[in-house]
Amino acid sequence: MKRKLDANDVPSPEAADDSVKNDVDNLDFESLNLDPRLRQALVKEKFTKPTLVQAKAIPLALEGKDILARAKTGSGKTAAYVLPILQTILQKKANDPSLKATTGLILVPTRELAEQVQNVITTFAAFCGKDVRSVNLTQKVSDAVQRTMLADYPDLIVSTPSRVIANLGSSALSLENLTHLVIDEADLVLSYGYDEDINALAKAIPRGVQTFLMSATLTAEVDTLKGLFCRSPVILKLEDKDDQGSGVSQFVVKCAEDEKFLLTYVIFKLQLIKGKVIIFVGDVDRCYRVKLFLEQFGIKSCVLNSELPVNSRLHVVQEFNKGVYDIIIAADEQEVMGARKSKKSKEAEENDAGEAAGSSDEDEGEAQKPSTTRSDKPSEKRRKTAGKDKDYGISRGIDFQNVACVLNFDLPTTSKSYTHRIGRTGRAGKTGMALSFVVPADQFGKHKPTSFPTAKHDETVLAKITKRQAKLGHEVKPYHFEMKQVDAFRYRMTDALRSITRLAVQEARAREIRQELIKSEKLKRHFEENPEELRQLRHDDELRSARIQPHLKHIPDYLMPSKGKKGISSENVGYVGFRKTSENRIRKAREKNRGKGKGRNYAGVKKVDPLKTFNRGRK
């Protein structure tokens, strides 16, 4: 079709955008010519229309083209590469039913994301019988078991780069027949310290492999991966309505360090936020401090702890998605506690042209400020990170469903991390809210028990967050609490915080790890042979993580604001006794010892009358 020329004899711009959008809106999975078994699985999962990234990427993938796609996490990127790969595998099996070869490799940065991708593959291959076999190499199984799993040549492998290299080195895995390579969350793979593994993998992969690079941002790491694996890829910079973040309302509250706990208590106890909430904090200790604090008021929550096994963490996410818990507390340690980053990432961390998101120098400064304080104590950093799962990550990739609010209890150290955190809510066209606590510089360090080092730079980081969000067309608005009404709850917050000591936090962490040891399948036989060790793990009654005060669970009417009384019905308030449910341990011990003759209560000692008894008093 010919286009009209303007006054300068230049063709007028094509009005293709609207037509493309209309084509995407009218497109359905039937028109993609997928295998009937895949369409049946899509119908079962109630997938009616493809998302923007699926509508764009799937036809290109079926044509055999390399794809570099930038789309928001939660936009359907996983299905965009899983469906074409499954389609290709089914076509090959139709031509040669006896074919046994590993043709697809999916690389992800974290174990949680690997499990999530594996579940998606299982869902879409539900009606394919034995024609499609996939293996997740990040599972905690022995090398011998993994070798057995790989000996049957599964069609698809989901793994982190380090596990692939380990199995290539032991000759358990062969990539000779590989036809599809996917690197999901490509901008994170190098940031998580997989540089050497990726370079080794680039040499092991045969030429002509179709490559998918899926990423939320186009950074220096993505350019590096594109140079290693892609052949003139089709670049998709997809800006859906959801990608603009229009559904997320962003608010910030400036408060003192102890007021973070006070406001958190008021928010959840008065039910100011309805629905599921993710609370992001600075580290694991902080997770348990917040959890124990909420427990004082009868508010249930769960902790996503990087020290626990991957299956336990996945179970926590599943329980949260099912609605068992409405509050999940997480420490995004890869970003907050200092993830290993490549030089290119540090130099151009925010040079994402598609997002127009500020200069790299800004975020470099953001990342360096907290790190300078940590670098003064290298031994402490090594001790803290020891035992943490390298493949752990929370703010990216994990599919948290129906999150109403993201609460940044501790502000992240970079604006990029902030963007990824708030991306957990307002997904798939839904609305959401992000609320961040910011400690002013003059308030930092005034309440030592609740202080956190990175809060020193909160105002600087907030300025950069505001600037970045403004460039993206979003506004970070101030949120004001009526402090006169909030202050009425302060004494209850103080009572609760007083019982949550550093020792209580350590005991809570130790107890959860002991519970995981008891649940461990691998240790069951060991405990059967050594029942005494199991008994020691279970009998931990003396470890009281925090003194529970039952009266804190109930809010008296005189404390309730007039508007708050309507929000909480009397049906939700259970019986709360005004007497202590357990005796005073110290008083009970004194009485017991007094009966045994241990210690003397001089005020209560009766004088011995020698005329009434033959027992002489002690000289």
Swiss-Prot record:
Short motif (DEAD box): ranges: 184-187
Pfam families: DEAD, Helicase_C
Motif position, Q motif: 27-55
Localization (cell): Nucleus, Nucleolus
Residue sites binding ATP per the record: A71, K72, T73, G74, S75, G76, K77, T78
GO terms classed as biological process: maturation of LSU-rRNA from tricistronic rRNA transcript (SSU-rRNA, 5.8S rRNA, LSU-rRNA)
Family statement drawn from the similarity comment of this UniProt entry: Belongs to the DEAD box helicase family. DDX56/DBP9 subfamily.
Domain of life per record: Eukaryota
Catalytic activity: ATP + H2O = ADP + phosphate + H(+)
Disordered: region residues: 1-22, 340-391, 586-619
EC number of the protein: 3.6.4.13
InterPro entries: DEAD/DEAH_box_helicase_dom, DEAD_box_RNA_helicase, Helicase_ATP-bd, Helicase_C-like, P-loop_NTPase, RNA_helicase_DEAD_Q_motif
Keywords linked to the UniProt accession: ATP-binding, Helicase, Hydrolase, Nucleotide-binding, Nucleus, Ribosome biogenesis, RNA-binding, rRNA processing
Alphabetized Gene3D superfamilies for the sequence: P-loop containing nucleotide triphosphate hydrolases
Domain Helicase ATP-binding: 58-236
Protein name (Swiss-Prot/TrEMBL): ATP-dependent RNA helicase dbp9
All residue ranges annotated as the Helicase C-terminal domain in the record: 247-484
Function of the molecule: ATP-binding RNA helicase involved in the biogenesis of 60S ribosomal subunits and is required for the normal formation of 25S and 5.8S rRNAs.
UniProt note: domains: The Q motif is unique to and characteristic of the DEAD box family of RNA helicases and controls ATP binding and hydrolysis.
Gene name in the database record: dbp9
One GO CC annotation: nucleolus
GO molecular function: ATP binding; ATP hydrolysis activity; DNA helicase activity; DNA/RNA helicase activity; RNA binding; RNA helicase activity
Biased composition (Basic residues): 587-599
Presence of keyword DNA-binding: no
